[in-house]
Amino acid sequence: MRFLLSAVFALLLVLSMPMRAMASDTVRGGQIFNTNCAACHAAGGNIVKSERTLRQADLEAFLPNYLTGHETGIVAQVTYGRNAMPAFLDVLSENEIADVAAYVEDQASHGWS
């Protein structure tokens, strides 16, 4: 009986966790992107370096680690920045950065249409 109660309690605890802890949120990522990233990356472009867009082919060509883990590569770029891109480590939370990465990956895989 004690085991059953413990199992039920554990299940309730897991089910009550916010979905954000379980998966990235592309809708929220889009909102965060529009607030923090779209000034330079509107519609997946890049106003600073036009050849380094957020389109799939450019991410594959220019973003370290993108081919081995799409969102992981995006998370690293957003978190630590590189070249002209600023770091967002002190601006966005880990969950917010993960949401932005999920949004960018989703948009890139659909051609930013």
Give the residues covered by each predicted segment.
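A broad, structure-centric signal for solvent-exposed, well-ordered loop/edge residues
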Residues: 8, 61, 66, 92-95, ...
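Gly/Gly-Pro-rich "capping" loops immediately C-terminal to redox-active cysteine motifs
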Residues: 26, 30, 42-75
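Processing junctions and N-termini across compartments
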Residues: 17, 31-34, 79
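Short, flexible active-site loop motifs that bind/organize anionic cofactors or intermediates
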Residues: 19, 64, 87-90
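Sequence context surrounding c-type heme c attachment/ligation sites in exported
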Residues: 27-38, 48, 69, 91-94, ...
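The canonical Cys-X-X-Cys-His
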Residues: 29, 33-43, 85, 100
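Axial heme c-ligation environment in periplasmic c-type cytochrome domains
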Residues: 48-57, 75-107, 112
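Post-cleavage N-terminal segment of exported redox proteins
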Residues: 1-25, 77, 106-113
